[in-house]
Structure formats: C-alpha cells, structure tokens
Amino acid sequence: MSRAPELDGAVAVQASYGDREASLAALAGVDTLLMISAAENEHRRTEHLTFVEAARYAGVKHIVYTSFVGAAPDSTFTLGRDHYATEQAIFESGMDFTILRDNFYADFMPQMAGEDHVLRGPAGDGLAALVTRSDVARVAATVLQDVAAHRSITYNLTGPMAITLAEVAAIISEAKDEHYSFHDETIPEAYESRKVWNAPSWQVDAWVSTYTAIANGDMREVSTDVETITGRPAESLAGFLSRDNPAPRN
C-alpha cells in the first residue's frame, strides 16, 4: 500500500515491524494480513515476532506470510532460521494462516555476478528451482482473494525446473548476449572474497550460505504450487530474462 497510496479504497499507514504500538494502530480493523518478510538485518527475527504478536493483539484473523523453502531451526541458509521462527510464532498465535515458502529469486541472479560477469560461490553442482517475484506476487494475490480456501496450508513456490549456477550463467549469457560464467569457490575462498564489502559477520554468513544451501540440495525441489494456485505455469529464468531484456526490434 505504501508504494501505491493512490489506489481507490487504499489507505496508507506507516509502521515498522519492530514497533509494536505503531503496528497495533496500523492493523486495527484488519482481518486478513499479507506479511512480506522484512529486509535482511540482524534484528529481523525480533522484528517479525513483534509484528506477529501485534497482529494477534490487533485481532487479525488470517495471516499470509512469505517465508523460505526449507525454513528450519538449522537451515543451511542462515536467514531461513528467521523464517522458521516466524512461522512457529504464527502457528502458535491462533490466527488462521497460509505460508508461502519461496525459493531463491530468479530476478536476482544477474545481480549476483561481479563486474567481470562471474558468479562466485560454493554451490558446486547443486540445483536451485528459482522462482520469480512476479510469480510469488500472483500467488499471494490469488490466495488473498479467497483465504479460506488456503487456510492452514504451506506452499512451496518454485520455478518450473531446478538448474545449476553454471546453467544460470549460460542462460544469462544467452539473454544478455554477453559471456557470464560460474566459479565454484571453496567456503574459505567465499569468505575471503567477500571481505572487500566489510559487511557484518551475520550478513557474510547469509551470503555464503546462499550457495552452500544450493550445494547441499536444499533448493532443488520443484513444486507445481504456482501453477496449481494461479492456473499459469511458473516462469523460468530464461522466460524472466527474455521479458526483462526484450530482443531489440529491427
């Protein structure tokens, strides 16, 4: 809503997930809530739990939450642990729920390459069933139109196939007509190469574990949930890139 306050019938309100009182005020009168996971930060778990509690106290009846494939207390992808804690808080809240567990986003793959067009990380030959954000949005929009039909269900949102990062690089190369490649770093190499960003340790752990989660096979499961819910097949990375980078007209 904050990005489109001009929509008919929409009222924009401001509240951060970690601000309980502001969230209570913002959620007053809300029956169905779409909770998009907060931006990555070291306090995200606390922010999420605060917001879920505020939703419960505000009287929200059904919460739809965008989580992560393989969310678990020991998730290889470190941020998946925050998603697990959030899911548990929702389950224990007494609110009706629908969980949308997203795979890694296909949209971000080109951005993961360096200026030299090399994707670097310890992913090996692991597979990822990358999903587009537009598919996740279509699923969420469909669910919100009839939440009762999706009550107490956890969906896995993926693309139509699982691919390696070497295949990702090849697909990007074809779409952009430029050469991209994948370099399979060791874990020590991955931590060393990311020192240049001078990022906090939790952030570097998240970056590196993006690749180790792929290497471990955590991201390989292909689900048909996107098509089942929306009636349209999930979009592939190649399809997304062709739409994002249309061929020039003669």
Roles of regions detected by a PLM:
Residues 1-8, 97, 245-248:
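Proteins with a high burden of low-complexity, intrinsically disordered sequence enriched in S/T/G/P/A and R
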Residues 1-3, 18-30, 38-49, 53-62, ...:
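Oxidoreductase cofactor-interface core, primarily capturing Rossmann-like NAD(P)-dependent enzymes
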Residues 5-19:
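Rossmann-fold cofactor-recognition segment
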Residues 11-12, 123, 161, 219, ...:
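Compositionally biased, intrinsically disordered low-complexity regions
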Residues 67-68, 233:
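Catalytic nucleophile serine of serine hydrolases
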Residues 188-250:
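A hydrophobic C-terminal alpha-helical subdomain
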